[in-house]
Amino acid sequence: MNTNSEQVLDQKSRPLRDLRISVTDRCNLRCTYCMPAEIFGQDYPFLPKGELLSFEELERLAKLFVHQFGVEKIRLTGGEPLMRKDMPELVGKLAGIKGIRDIAMTTNGVLLPVYADKLKKAGLKRVTVSLDSLDDERFKSINGRGVSVSKVLAGIEAAKKAGLGVKINMVVQKGVNEKDILPMARYFKEKGHILRFIEFMDVGNTNEWNRQSVVAKADIIRIINEDMPIEPIDPNYEGEVAKRYRYLDGSGEIGFISSVSDAFCTTCNRARLSAKGELFTCLFASSGFDLRTLIRSGQTDQELAEAIGTVWRNRDDQYSLDRALAKAVPRKKVEMSYIGG
C-alpha cells in the first residue's frame, strides 16, 4: 500500500485496493452472455468519442486512486479494450504512476497478435483472455461473429511470446458449453496457462440469465477432479476473487469464480470506472457516480479525491450475497460491456 495514501473503508469495512477501468463500450465480438447481437446491433447507441474519458483524464483519476486511496492494481477492460485506439499509450501513462504494482488487461484476444509486443513494452504485466470453448462451431455460435478459436489461440501465443503473463477465463453455461470443461482444462494444463471457470452471472439486463443455466463451482470441480485430481490452495492475496486449486500431479493450477454459488462480496475491494467516467462500486450496480462532469467543470484533485472518498465510504453493496439469500431486489443493472467484467 502507498504509505502516503488514506485507508478508506466502506460501510462493511472493505478497503479500496483494485481499480478496473473500462476504456470503451465497443467490442468486435457479440458473446451471448455479454453483448447479444440482437440487442447490440448496428443501431445500438454506443458512446461517441467525445463522451469517453481521454487518456489524460484517465491518468489523472488513476493517480488519485493510487496516491490518495492506496490502489495497487489496475485492470483495463471494455467492451474490448483493444478496440480503443493507441492503448499502448495509455498503458505507458499508467505504468509511470508511482505506487502501481500491477497493470493487467481483460481481452478477447483477437487483436493481441497486433498489440501484445507494444503493450508489454509500454508496461502491461499480464492479460486475461476470454475463451469459452475449443470447439470451433460452438465458439463461433457463442461469440456471435463467427470468429474461430484459432484467432484467440493465436492471441494467447502472441501474449506469451511477448512475455506477458496469461490467464484464461471460461464462462460456463448449462446446455451451452459444459461439455467443454474437461477439454479446456486438459488443453491449458498442458500449455501451462491458468484457466479460471466463471459461473454464468446475471450482469446487465440482456443476457437472459436464469439460475437453471448456471453450472455451479462444486459441479465443475467434481467433473475435473474425477479426471484430473485437484486440491484447494491458499489465495495469493487477501480479497482474491478466484478460488485457487492445483493439480495433484504438480502440473499447474486452475481457478473458480463463483459469484452465484459462493459469493465473495465480503472481501470485494474493487472500484470500477466506466468509459464515460462513472464510478461504480459493484459489478451489479444500477448507477454510478459521475466523475467526468467534475473533471470537466474544473474541479481540483483534492475535490475529486473527496468525492471518490465519499462514494467509497457510503458503499454497502453486497448484491451476490443478497441474491443467494433471496434478498436481492429486482432492478435494472448496468451492462457488463459498459462497466467491464
From Swiss-Prot:
Annotated Radical SAM core domain residues: 11-231
Signal sequence, renumbered to the chain: none
* Cofactor, how bound (note): Binds 2 [4Fe-4S] clusters. Binds 1 [4Fe-4S] cluster coordinated with 3 cysteines and an exchangeable S-adenosyl-L-methionine and 1 [4Fe-4S] cluster coordinated with 3 cysteines and the GTP-derived substrate.
Q: What class of enzyme is it?
A: lyase
Which EC numbers does the record give? 4.1.99.22
Q: Which molecular function terms from Gene Ontology are attached?
A: 4 iron, 4 sulfur cluster binding; cyclic pyranopterin monophosphate synthase activity; GTP 3',8'-cyclase activity; GTP binding; metal ion binding; S-adenosyl-L-methionine binding
Which reaction equation describes what this protein catalyses?
Answer: GTP + AH2 + S-adenosyl-L-methionine = (8S)-3',8-cyclo-7,8-dihydroguanosine 5'-triphosphate + 5'-deoxyadenosine + L-methionine + A + H(+)
- Pathway involvement of the protein, from the record: Cofactor biosynthesis; molybdopterin biosynthesis
Record: residues binding [4Fe-4S] cluster 1:
27, 31, 34
**Which residues are listed for [4Fe-4S] cluster 2 binding in this entry?**
265, 268, 282
Q: Gene3D superfamilies, from UniProt?
A: Aldolase class I
List residues binding GTP. Answer: 20, 75, 106, 167, 270-272
Provide the alphabetized UniProt keywords: 4Fe-4S, GTP-binding, Iron, Iron-sulfur, Lyase, Metal-binding, Molybdenum cofactor biosynthesis, Nucleotide-binding, S-adenosyl-L-methionine
Q: Which cofactor does it need?
A: [4Fe-4S] cluster
User: Which is a GO BP term held by this UniProt record?
Assistant: Mo-molybdopterin cofactor biosynthetic process
| Amino acids binding S-adenosyl-L-methionine | 33, 79, 130, 201
Looking up InterPro entries in the UniProt record yields: Aldolase_TIM, Elp3/MiaA/NifB-like_rSAM, MoaA, MoaA_NifB_PqqE_Fe-S-bd_CS, MoaA_twitch, MoCo_biosynth_MoaA/MoaC, rSAM
Q: What role is this protein assigned?
A: Catalyzes the cyclization of GTP to (8S)-3',8-cyclo-7,8-dihydroguanosine 5'-triphosphate.
Q: How does it assemble?
A: Monomer and homodimer.
State the family it belongs to. Answer: Belongs to the radical SAM superfamily. MoaA family.
- Protein's name according to its UniProt entry: GTP 3',8-cyclase
